[in-house]
């Protein structure tokens, strides 16, 4: 039965979609979320604490958290465990947020569970009302005016935790929605907490400095539960090669005086050489070109980087560059937080020889770093008995156990690793990749991965951003790293940055940073109707060594992949 023919599923979906959904908001009232955690925690307690029926891994981070969650899910499934995976946003269908053993939740089971929880919510509200006479509340969960209503994300979490208990999963992987401190997922006691990375995103809510952002994310750490910190190589890489001062020292002598232009010399791409991008053998992991000692020093956290051609320049904005000192400071902050909670602490400083031996593709250096984070979690849960005091039936020896995983399971997961809208190749003729990269750091990470896997390709970026995101930073990265940039907008989505605004941001940025560099300006074009552009692009003969990369948000990635799959 199609989901559109399942009235119970449609009713449950309508109920969820009518809840307050901060994912659709341009500005999120972060300071009001603390009160929300109490009602979620109380409701889960009323339900019998379904989250205590399985091991939980809780993953936060500015970027990389979705990939780490996906890696853990695929590793544990390869090892034979039953796994629940809660992530956001969904790409095509709502049930993708609630995955059990690698598949979206069955729609009928989802609908039945949601209906049951609605009735339990009514009972919970009636009991709460009896105990809190005089407090304004409504029993009807369908009434949007109810001030004490749980939000879309809160309901989604409760549904997920209940589904996982019903499915008797061995382990649940929970991805933080935003931040950590006031995220609904933080009501759960996690057996392992993970901080994948820290960079600039959601600054309005989390703070305008890396330390403030890190503290909000580290608030997920629980007493006696290990913390794995992945802040390091990946963050430093994403933010740039090194701090702004070193960039200036390495700047080309021909850069305009006073402009933030930083050229890194290398061999140019041979535009005449065409490469068959459909041949996966051309997805390479070649060693980098040798560089001078000073430049090698500047790249000490950028191992394996493919050099850019001479006309590539890095448009640096010092306040958004993550330095080596930043990385060390955030690591120490994570260490202190773990110490305060009596939590064992593990920091990822380099990729192990085992993870380094995993296949490429599908693992580029960025994914490899995230796989390293995942394997640290796997190692902890393979040797540590999870907290027995929090589980029902704690006297039962089967209520607490380890999760041993063989290396063969990790290797098998790596060999077939893939995730929707995360460096997802949706077409090979023409070659089109979609990625949900939606901040400066994730754009830089994507471009690094693309250059590693397709070193001789011409990379054309199609960019549509959301209001409130760092469009300037994303454009700056693409100006530095892509061969061509096409600015567009999601015309049917009020959250999309209007194309005229993107054009203005682009013009202002280039005027301020590279006014005399015509090659940068020639990279940029506009596509007022990205749907028409995509249909036309798919219909034309393949560009040989050209790759079209749709970037800027998961919502844009979702739309592009649907159009491409219908067209190609």
Where are these regions (language model features)?
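Nucleotide phosphate-binding/pyrophosphate-handling subdomain across enzymes
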Residues: 171-174, 183-186, 190-194, 199, ...
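Short functional linear segments
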Residues: 1-61, 68-79, 85-86, 126-147
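Flexible active-site lid/hinge loop adjacent to a nucleotide/diphosphate
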Residues: 143-244, 304, 309-324
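C-terminal helical cap/extension that packs against the catalytic core
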Residues: 233-237, 241-243, 310-331, 368, ...
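Long intrinsically disordered, low-complexity regions that are acidic and Ser/Thr-rich
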Residues: 243-316
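N-terminal phosphate/diphosphate-binding loop that engages ATP/GTP or pyrophosphate donors
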Residues: 71-123
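Hydrophobic alpha-helical packing residues
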Residues: 72-77, 164, 478, 506, ...
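Active-site-proximal loop/hinge segments that shape catalytic or ion-binding/gating pockets
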Residues: 553
């Amino acid at each position: 039965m199609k989901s559109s023919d399942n009235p119970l599923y449609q009713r449950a979906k309508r109920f969820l979609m009518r809840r307050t959904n901060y994912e659709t908001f341009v500005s999120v009232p972060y300071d009001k979320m603390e009160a929300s955690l109490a009602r979620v925690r109380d409701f889960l307690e009323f339900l019998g604490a379904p989250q205590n029926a399985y091991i939980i891994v809780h993953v936060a981070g500015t970027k990389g958290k979705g990939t780490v969650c996906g890696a853990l899910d695929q590793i544990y499934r390869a090892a034979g465990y039953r796994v629940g995976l809660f992530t956001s946003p969904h790409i095509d269908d709502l049930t993708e947020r609630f995955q059990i053993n690698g598949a979206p939740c069955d729609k009928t089971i989802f609908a039945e569970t949601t209906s049951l929880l609605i009735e339990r919510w009514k009972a919970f509200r009636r009991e709460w009302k009896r105990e809190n006479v005089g407090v304004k509340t409504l029993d009807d969960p369908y009434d949007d005016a109810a001030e004490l209503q749980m939000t879309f994300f809160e309901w989604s979490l409760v549904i997920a935790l209940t589904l996982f208990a019903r499915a008797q999963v061995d382990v649940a992987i929970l991805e933080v929605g935003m931040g950590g401190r006031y995220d609904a997922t933080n009501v759960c006691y996690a057996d392992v907490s993970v901080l994948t990375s820290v960079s600039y995103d959601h600054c309005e809510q989390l703070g305008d400095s890396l330390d403030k952002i890190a503290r909000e994310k580290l608030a997920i750490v629980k007493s006696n539960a290990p913390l794995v910190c992945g802040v390091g190589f990946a963050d430093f890489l994403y933010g740039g090669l090194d701090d702004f001062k070193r960039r200036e020292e390495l700047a080309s002598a021909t850069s305009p005086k006073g402009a933030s232009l930083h050229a890194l010399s290398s061999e140019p791409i041979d535009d005449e050489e065409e490469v068959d991008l459909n041949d996966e053998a051309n997805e390479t992991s070649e060693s980098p070109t040798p560089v001078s000692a000073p430049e090698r020093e500047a790249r000490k956290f950028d191992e394996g980087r493919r050099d850019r051609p001479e006309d590539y320049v890095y448009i640096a904005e010092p306040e958004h560059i993550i330095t080596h000192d930043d990385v060390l400071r955030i690591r120490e902050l994570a260490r202190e937080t773990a110490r305060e909670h009596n939590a064992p602490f593990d920091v990822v400083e380099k990729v192990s020889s085992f993870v380094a031996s995993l296949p490429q593709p599908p693992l580029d250096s960025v994914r490899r770093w995230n796989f390293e984070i995942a394997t640290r979690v796997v190692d902890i849960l393979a040797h540590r008995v999870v907290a027995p005091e929090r589980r029902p039936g704690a006297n039962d020896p089967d209520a607490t156990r380890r999760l041993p995983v063989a290396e063969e399971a990790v290797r098998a997961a790596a060999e077939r690793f893939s995730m929707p809208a995360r460096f997802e190749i949706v077409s090979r003729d023409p070659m089109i990749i979609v990625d949900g990269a939606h901040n400066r750091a994730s754009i830089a990470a994507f471009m690094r991965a693309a250059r590693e896997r397709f070193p001789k390709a011409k990379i054309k970026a199609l960019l549509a951003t959301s209001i409130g995101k760092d469009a300037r930073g994303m454009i700056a990265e693409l100006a530095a790293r892509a061969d061509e940039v096409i600015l567009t907008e999601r015309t049917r989505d009020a959250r999309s940055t209007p194309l005229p605004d993107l054009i203005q941001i682009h013009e202002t940025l280039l005027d301020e940073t590279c006014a005399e560099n015509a090659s940068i300006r020639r990279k940029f074009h506009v596509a007022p109707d990205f749907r028409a552009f995509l249909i036309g692009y798919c219909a034309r003969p393949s560009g040989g060594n050209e790759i079209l990369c749709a970037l800027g948000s998961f919502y844009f990635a979702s739309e592009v992949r649907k159009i491409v799959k219908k067209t190609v």
